[in-house]
Amino acid sequence: KELQENYNICVSDDFFGVLETDTGFVYSDLSVKSAINAACKLGAHTLCDEIVRICKENGVYKIQTQNSSIQAKQILISAGSYVNEVLGVCEFDLPKVPVGIRRKVVNWFDTDSYKLSQGFPAFILEFEDDYFYGFPDFADGLKVGRDKVGEIISTREERVEFGSYEQDTLDIGKHIKEFFPDLKDFSKGSVCTYPLSPDDDFIIDFLDENLFFMGGLSHGFKFAPALGLLGVKALQTQKLDPSIKQYFSLKRFG
């Protein structure tokens, strides 16, 4: 009843809601940009889309880019959906990192309600064996995604543009108005990808004596400051914190 009265969300009587008043949402692009800017202020250099190959000679990694050659004693790799492309440039033996890729879509809907300015929050809503998630309208409409649907792909080329499949609008649009009755027409959609480890959790481990990997889970940008600190400490000490190793080691997959 309170969900309907306060937020105009229609659910059955067996639903209950939890409101977390001290939470919010993160702009992914801005958070990544902020992290890069902070790193540059500390002396980091950025090269985008330039690594051609990485080899290892006498314990030193030699990184060949399109325009230069870099030598390093240690490497930290943080990669998402296309991790195997990144690891594929390494010309030495590494354990396989089992990360798949799911093509995902999100939809926007026009509305005069569900606005950030009206106090409407970001949300997660259970639905069958899945859940909808989304964000209030603060510019382009109510943004809605659905967690477990989407096509399993293996290459960038298979991440086709929005609208290539009928399900790009049906997976969300077929049911979402049952819960949000004030939604108007579908406005637009976009495509992204989820990296998928076998147990839907991070993989954090040494792949080589001085090559440390973090990845395997979507939305890693939210945890980037903590993951970065963890990775640097692991390389400095040459060991992984036992609590991290227990839950996130690559060895858990056998």
Where are these regions (language model features)?
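Flavin (FAD/FMN) cofactor-binding and adjacent substrate-gating region
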Residues: 1-43, 47-49, 53-59
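A short alpha-helix-loop-beta-strand transition element characteristic
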Residues: 1-4, 12, 94-99, 185, ...
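Short loop/edge segments at beta-strand edges and connector loops
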Residues: 47-50, 65, 188-190
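Short, hydrophobic/aromatic-rich segments at coil-to-beta transitions
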Residues: 59-63, 119-122
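Active-site acidic short loop of glycosyltransferases
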Residues: 65, 72-73, 209
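Short hydrophobic core segments
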Residues: 70-86, 228
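Active-site substrate-recognition segment that forms the wall
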Residues: 81-209
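C-terminal catalytic lobe of FAD-dependent flavoproteins
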Residues: 178-254
